[in-house]
Structure formats: structure tokens, C-alpha cells
């Protein structure tokens, strides 16, 4: 096979398609073996498939009203495997906590034009399995979010097969990024910084990088 054809076959396979060759009237499936979540994925969460083979949902609005075209709609309303890509760039100011409860999800922040995507104002928490988050900025802050005991800018627990890659997480009132009680989890090549020590926590001065743990969890190059 020439190089172009090899690349096409690899692309179709990564998209979840079965590639079949005709040989003497018999179909043969080309098997590449198990594929990583994406090139460069490492650690226990590296084989997460996310939304591979499913629908593609395009974010066309920075609003947080939950209508079609918003990030919240793609996360909370759609079912089944899905990959979320962005036609817009800028900051999504959340109106309330954003909770990921439906798995088989990829959020590809690298698809946003310009300066990319920032998610601000409230916590983002993952409770779903088989989730890929890439190239996103999380800036919770303490202006809109009222959590007396503090809140994590990005967090999650109780999930399996999760990988977070090339994200930056800052401005929390508890921990910036806390992930525990997960299995087959990776957080890699992320910036975790600038917790708000005087952010309004009931304990007084309080603000930390994160609580990390779980079974088969990898934290590297952060």
C-alpha cells in the first residue's frame, strides 16, 4: 500500500470504521491492534476511546443557556459516543456547575480557532467513564461561584478510563484539580497553578494544587 492509502486506512480505523479488503472474494479486516486515545497519550488512561466512532457535535456559541450549539448542550443533553469540537473561541462563562455524567465523550479544545477555549465561573466535574479532555483552560474564580466550603476548578471521581491532556487549571477556592477514586486515569502535560488562598473558604486561608489518587492512575509532566 502506498503512503496516502495507509494514512487513509489509519484515519478510518481511528474513526471506528471497519476496513475490509477484497481478496479472492473473501473480506479481510485490517487489524491495527489496540489504538491509543491519541498520539502522545501515556499512562493508565492512554487507551481511553472517548467519543471515537460516534457523532461530531460543533460548539457554535459561547453562551451557557443549554441550547443547541452550546458546550453544555453537547455535554448534558446528547447521548452515546460523541466528539465535541469548536467553531468559536473565547471564554464560556458558566451560569452554574458543569457536571459530566454521560461518558463516551471527547472534548477537543484544540479545534477552537484563535486563542482557544476557556471555561470560567463555576466548577467542572467529571463523573463519567471513557472521557477525553484536551487543550482546555479552566478558570473558576470566586466571583460567581458561591461554595462556602470551596470548590475545585476541575475535578472528578468514581470514573474509569479518563485522560486529561494539555489543559491548564487555575483560580480555585479549594483545590485546582482533584481526581481520586478513579481507575485507568491519566492527567498529563497540564498546568495546575494559582489557587486562590484567600478565595472565601470557610476555613479561612485555603487553596491547594489538588488531591490525586485512585487505582491505576498516572500523573506525569504536569
Annotated model-derived regions:
Residues 1-6:
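Positively charged n-region of N-terminal signal peptides that target proteins for export
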Residues 7-18:
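Bacterial N-terminal signal peptides
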Residues 21-27:
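Boundary at the C-terminal end of the N-terminal hydrophobic targeting segment
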Residues 36-84:
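Acidic Gly/Asp/Thr-rich repetitive segments characteristic of extracellular carbohydrate-active
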Residues 63-65, 82, 89-91, 111-114:
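Acidic glycine-/aspartate-rich tracts in secreted/extracellular proteins
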Residues 71-80, 92-108, 115-135, 140-160, ...:
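Extracellular beta-strand-rich solenoid/capping regions of secreted or surface-exposed proteins
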Residues 104, 108-109, 129-142, 158-171, ...:
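Right-handed parallel beta-helix
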Residues 151, 174-176, 207:
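Conserved positions at the start
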Amino acid at each position: 500500500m502506498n503512503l496516502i492509502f495507509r494514512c487513509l486506512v489509519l484515519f478510518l480505523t481511528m474513526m471506528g470504521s471497519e476496513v475490509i479488503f477484497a481478496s479472492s472474494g473473501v473480506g479481510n479486516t485490517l487489524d491495527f491492534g489496540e489504538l491509543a486515545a491519541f498520539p502522545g497519550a501515556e499512562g493508565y488512561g492512554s487507551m481511553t476511546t472517548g467519543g471515537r466512532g460516534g457523532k461530531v457535535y460543533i460548539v457554535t456559541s459561547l453562551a451557557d443557556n443549554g441550547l443547541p450549539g452550546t458546550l453544555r448542550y453537547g455535554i448534558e443533553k446528547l447521548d452515546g459516543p460523541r466528539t465535541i469540537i469548536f467553531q468559536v473561541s473565547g471564554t464560556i462563562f458558566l451560569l452554574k456547575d458543569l457536571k459530566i455524567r454521560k461518558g463516551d465523550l471527547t472534548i477537543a479544545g484544540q479545534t477552537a480557532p484563535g486563542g482557544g477555549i476557556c471555561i470560567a465561573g463555576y466548577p467542572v466535574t467529571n463523573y463519567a467513564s471513557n472521557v477525553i479532555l484536551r487543550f482546555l483552560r479552566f478558570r473558576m474564580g470566586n466571583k460567581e461561584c458561591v461554595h462556602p466550603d470551596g470548590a475545585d476548578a476541575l475535578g472528578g471521581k468514581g470514573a474509569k478510563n479518563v485522560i486529561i491532556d494539555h489543559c491548564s487549571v487555575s483560580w480555585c477556592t479549594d483545590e485546582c484539580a482533584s481526581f481520586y477514586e478513579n481507575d485507568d486515569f491519566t492527567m498529563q502535560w497540564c498546568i495546575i497553578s494559582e489557587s486562590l488562598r484567600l478565595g472565601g473558604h470557610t476555613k479561612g486561608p485555603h487553596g491547594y494544587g489538588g488531591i490525586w489518587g485512585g487505582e491505576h492512575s498516572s500523573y506525569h509532566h504536569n
